[in-house]
């Protein structure tokens, strides 16, 4: 009777909570995705730290632009995540044509969001950055921060289209259960970003500061 009771509890546990194989598979998929998202957010963190060594105005300008880019990142993430729901279902059913269509939608949606964001940044970049600035001390620091922010925004905009395309491809790969590849790509991106930031911000050897 005790054996039957334990078996019954085990069956309830598996139905309601899941078995070890499920959690192992889940962790193998989820952990690389968690690490990738953390690494992606680490890029702006590194930028703020390194630029902060140059001065308060530079730090303020970069931090403000990173806030704007963060909103853009959320918009792209929402666009590709919505289509990923269908993409995962298509792939699970073996409908590769439907999976291809979902990828196309993600790519077009991400590029559309990017086009809208770039249009706003080009036409209203100064106004958007100015929303974060108030010259309470009246010492001209806000104008300096605004100038640095506008300069930094022009540089960041260069990478928006590659970022959008990368997000579309990365989510498509994740739908197939391959979450390790995007994580490795994120490590490579953060590593190259950190090295280039250090070289271009502080100047090493022939590279000007």
Which residue stretches match the model-derived regions?
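Single conserved hydrophobic/aromatic residue that forms the stacking wall/gate
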Residues: 1-13
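Residue-level signal for short hydrophobic patches within transmembrane helices
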Residues: 19, 23-42, 46, 68-75, ...
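Residue-level recognition of transmembrane alpha-helices
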Residues: 30, 63-66, 110, 153-156, ...
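Helix-loop interface residues and adjacent transmembrane-helix termini in multi-pass membrane transporters
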Residues: 42-45, 53-56, 90-93, 175-176, ...
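Interfacial/gating helices of multi-pass transporter permease domains
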Residues: 51-70, 102, 140-151
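Small-residue-rich hydrophobic transmembrane alpha-helices
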Residues: 59-122, 163-182
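Short membrane-interface helical motifs at transmembrane helix boundaries
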Residues: 116-154, 204
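Membrane-interface helix-loop junctions in multi-pass transport and translocation proteins
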Residues: 190-209
């Amino acid at each position: 009777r005790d054996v039957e009771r334990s078996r019954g509890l085990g069956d309830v546990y598996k139905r309601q909570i899941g078995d070890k194989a499920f959690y192992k598979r889940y962790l193998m998929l989820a952990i690389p995705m968690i690490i990738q998202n953390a690494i992606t957010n680490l890029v702006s963190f590194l930028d703020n730290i390194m630029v902060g060594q140059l001065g308060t105005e530079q730090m303020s300008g970069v931090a403000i632009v990173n806030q704007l880019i963060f909103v853009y990142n959320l918009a792209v993430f929402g666009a590709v995540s919505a289509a990923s729901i269908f993409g995962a279902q298509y792939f699970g059913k073996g409908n590769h044509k439907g999976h291809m269509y979902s990828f196309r939608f993600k790519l077009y949606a991400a590029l559309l969001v990017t086009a809208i964001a770039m249009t706003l940044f080009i036409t209203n970049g100064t106004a958007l950055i100015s929303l974060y600035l108030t010259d309470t001390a009246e010492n001209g620091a806000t104008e300096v921060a605004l100038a640095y922010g506008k300069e930094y925004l022009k540089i960041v905009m260069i990478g928006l289209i590659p970022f959008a395309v990368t997000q579309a491809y990365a989510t498509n790969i994740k739908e197939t259960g391959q979450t390790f590849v995007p994580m490795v790509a994120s490590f490579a991106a953060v590593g190259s970003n950190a090295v280039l930031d250090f070289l271009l911000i502080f100047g090493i050897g022939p590279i000007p500061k």
